[in-house]
Amino acid sequence: RARTSTLSSPESCTCLRRLPDSEDLILFWNDSEYISDHHHFGIRSPLSAAISSDGGRSWNKIGDIDAGDCMLTNIGCTFLSSGAAVLTYLKTPDPEIENGVYRGTRSTKAEREAQFEMELMAALIPRDWFTQ
């Protein structure tokens, strides 16, 4: 049965995985508030991770993987035999953010075109980071 996670997030994809050799769930998501005027209803930064040891009924934030005046989205994750996670995601400038805060005005056409300067990112996260 579906239920709310109680985690704040804009319009952005998440990535849910089970920690290898464990019943714990790991969620990667954008830990930011809903902003109705923003083009994705909130800032897609930071890219964060949370763990659930009760089947997703409650979540504890572990930490941030990346952050900045950018959009961090299209998350994918696979675990290696060592238990380390390989997290891939897209990083692109968000002209509506200044110093981590929504500036309150819509981006210009030129600023939106700059969003096509995208980087594919990869992070290698050791297994023990999830259970620190």
Where in this protein do the model-derived segments appear?
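Asp-box/BNR beta-propeller blade signature and adjacent active/binding-site loops
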Residues: 1-132
